[in-house]
Amino acid sequence: MTSFAYTQKALELQQRFDTEALAAAELQLIVHDSLSPNDRAFIAAAEMFWLASVDPEGSPTVSFKGGAKGFVRMPDDTTLLFPCFDGNGMFFSMGNIASTSQVGLLFMDFVTPSRLRVQGDAHLTDDPAIVGLWPGAQFAVKVDITALITNCPRYIPRMQRLDGSRYVPDTTNGEQPIPGWKRIDAIQDVLPKRDQNKADTVGGLLTMDQWGEMVETGDPLA
């Protein structure tokens, strides 16, 4: 039985809109605390999810996480593992996890469509046996699942998948192309040492406006 429970304000809204009985039934029907076979198959096929976290003051943020199919691992029915790949260096979500641990994950399939929500307590790990599951990972995140919520596909726009991201690290050696924003002239002096002096190898420096135009036009090198 999951420990998931409605807040007082949620209960008040249920009463206002006559959904108390429905919401109580849904706790039994769609909320669970361990991965079902369907959950496992859905997550194993995912190339992305959205990660919600909160800082010590309770301010939330949400970030997009992507990888190759199967990049979210499930060592058992109550645990998720996922990598932290090279990003923008701000570590908003990872800093929140290190501070408060509470997370929400939203897995979406826009083709079918379908979705799955996961709530849990998360912790950062440098364990080589875990981090080594993803060549190119800086470290990893372990999520102890507290609730899974199966949602209907209502309101999800149906889309067609075209291609995966070219920036996902190679699953055998961890190599990945240099993203376009690391070519912006204004940030060259503050890039990590490992990324400095690489712009000339991939087409040279860009201004912020040039990079912005690449993003707006869907340039895959952005």
Language-model region placement:
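Binding-site signature for planar aromatic cofactors or substrates
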Residues: M1-A222
